[in-house]
């Protein structure tokens, strides 16, 4: 995480804690000519528009006082959606028995992408059951080799 995003997280985390919401992720990215600061929040049962608006208002007030971001940007606060990213240890633990999409930095047993059920996670290794054509295969993926992981929708 960049120093600027760490400073933004230091501003946002107390606000989400106060509102009893989980801070899922913070992303600062450019789309076309515009910059966006995207804050993703959640709670059991999901968040509603009023909670997103409350976080947006409070974050906006705090950022106006001492904004670590020098350029102009749009602030967006939303739910992470059905395919929420898995980043923190707790995210992986909560995803056990759920359908996930995982990519790795380098091939593991000839693969860089897996989509299947996360069978277990012990803090260092993800165990995923995938379907390859008609057979089920269990794959072990070291956590330190994971580039991205998210919940996925199974069709």
Swiss-Prot record:
Give UniProt keywords alphabetically: Cytoplasm, Ribosome biogenesis
Recorded hits in Gene3D superfamilies, A to Z, give: Ribosome maturation factor RimP, C-terminal domain, RimP-like superfamily, N-terminal
Q: Which superkingdom heads the taxonomic lineage of this protein's source?
A: Bacteria
Q: Which GO terms of type biological process are on file?
A: ribosomal small subunit assembly; translation
Q: Which GO terms describe its cellular component?
A: cytosol
What Pfam families does UniProt report for this protein, alphabetically? DUF150_C, RimP_N
Where is it located?
Cytoplasm
Q: Which SUPFAM superfamilies match?
A: YhbC-like, C-terminal domain (SSF74942), YhbC-like, N-terminal domain (SSF75420)
Known function: Required for maturation of 30S ribosomal subunits.
The family this protein is said to belong to: Belongs to the RimP family.
HAMAP family given for it? RimP
The name on file for this protein is Ribosome maturation factor RimP
Organismal lineage: Bacteria, Bacillati, Bacillota, Bacilli, Bacillales
């Amino acid at each position: 995480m960049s120093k600027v995003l760490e400073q933004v997280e230091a501003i946002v985390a107390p606000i989400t804690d106060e509102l009893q919401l989980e801070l899922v992720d913070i992303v600062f990215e450019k789309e076309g000519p515009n910059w966006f600061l995207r804050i993703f929040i959640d709670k059991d049962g999901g968040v509603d528009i009023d909670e997103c608006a409350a976080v947006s208002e409070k974050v906006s007030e705090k950022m106006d006082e001492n904004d670590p971001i020098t350029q102009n940007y749009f602030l967006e606060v939303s739910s992470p959606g059905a395919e929420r990213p898995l980043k923190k240890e707790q995210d992986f633990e909560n995803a056990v028995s759920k359908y996930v999409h995982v990519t790795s930095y380098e091939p593991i047993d000839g693969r860089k992408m897996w989509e299947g059920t996360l069978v277990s996670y012990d803090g260092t290794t993800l165990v995923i059951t995938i379907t390859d054509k008609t057979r089920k295969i269990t794959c072990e993926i070291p956590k330190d080799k994971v580039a991205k992981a998210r919940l996925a929708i199974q069709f």
